[in-house]
Amino acid sequence: MSQPMTQERAAAVGSAVNALWDPNSLANPYPAYERVRALGEGGVLEAQFPDWKALFLTGHAACSAVLRSPHALSGNGIQNLDGERSEGVRLLQSMMLFHNGLSHQRLRGLVSSAFTPRVVEEQRELVRSLLDSLLDDLAARGGGDIVADVSNPLPARVIMGMLGLKGDDEARFVGWTQSVADLIGGMNQSPELMGRIDADAREMRAFFQHLAEELRANPQPGLLSAMSAVQDGGERLSGDELLSNAVLLLAAGHETTSNLIPGGLLELSRQPDAWAALVENPRHPNVADELLRVVSPVQFDGRTLSADVSVGEMMLPGGNLAQLILGAANRDPGVFSDPDRIDWERPNSNRHLALAAGPHYCLGASLARLEISETFAALATRFPNLRVTDTNPPFKPNPVLRGVQRLDVRVD
C-alpha cells in the first residue's frame, strides 16, 4: 500500500490532501478527490508527515470495509476532548454517532425502538401536504430560493413533527442544526464560531431538559416522549444522552435532505437529459438512491483503526486515522460506470455509501429516501420547466456536510 515517501511525492501528497479542505474546492471537490485517488493504491492513500499521518480512502471497497469493521472506531477524537470546557463538545460526546461497540448498541437500541418503519411511512402524507403548500407558494411567486423556500422548511417540519416539537420554534431549531453541522465539519472554527456553538448548546440543553421532564410527567405523541420513557432492561437514557441524541435526530433529520434537495437540482440543471427523464417518470424507484450517490450530502467520515482492517488482499494497519472520502467512493469508476452522470436506470445505485454502512448506518435512511423521492416527484410533476438561474451558487463553508447556501430557481 505504501510507496517510498520521496521529497517529490511528499509534496504531491501534501498538496492533494490540502486541496480537500481548500474553500475553493467546495463548489466542485471531485477533481481534488481524483488527485488523491490517483496518488493512492487500491483506493487508499497513506499520508505520512513529521507530525501526523492518516489514510485517505477514495475507493468504494476500502470505505465499505472500514464502515463495516468493528475495529474502525467513530468519535475517538471527540471522546478524548474535555467536555467540561465546551458545551458543544459535551453535546457531541453523548451522541450515539460517536460511540462504539456495546455503548453504541445500547444507545442505538434505545433510540431506534422509538423510530420504526411504520412511524416513517406515516410521514408520507405529511410530506406530500407540506410539499403542496411550499410549492404553491413557490409557484405564486414564479420562483425563489429553493433552500429557504423548500429544502430548509420541509425536513425541519417533518422531523419536528416526529419528535413532537412545536412548529413555532422552527427557526430556532434550524439554527441549532446549523450549529451542530458547523461543529462536526465546518471550516474556520474560530473562537467567535465556537462561542456561538457553545451558546446554542447551552440553550439546547436547557430546552430539552425542561421538555424531557414535562414529557416524563405527561407523555405526548412523538419520538421525544417515547425516548424519554423507553427502557431496555430497566435502563433509560440519561439526561445527557437524551439531549444529545434528540439533537442528533433533529440535525440528521434535517441536514441530509436539506443539503440534498438543492444539490440534486444543481446537478440536474447541468444534466438536462436526466431532468427530462425525471419529468417523464417522476416516481422512478431509483431517484433517491441515485441522487444520494451523486450528491453525497456527507462527503467525509472519520474512523480510528483499533486493529488491522482487510480490504480484499490489502491490509489497512491498525493505529491509523482513516479519512473516508464518501463523495469519492460514491463516484468510484470501478463500481459505478460513468460515475459523474445521473442515470436513473443504473442497476447498482443503492450500493452508494451516502448513508454510511455497518453499525453506524443512518438511522433515518428510510425517512431521507421518502423525503427525497417525494420532493423530486413533486418538483418534476409541478414544474417540468423549472430552471436554476444561478448555476454557480455559494456553498456553505463545510466540506464534510456539503451543501448549497442558496439556489435561485424559476418555475414559470
Task: Describe each PLM feature range.
Residues 1-412:
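Cytochrome P450
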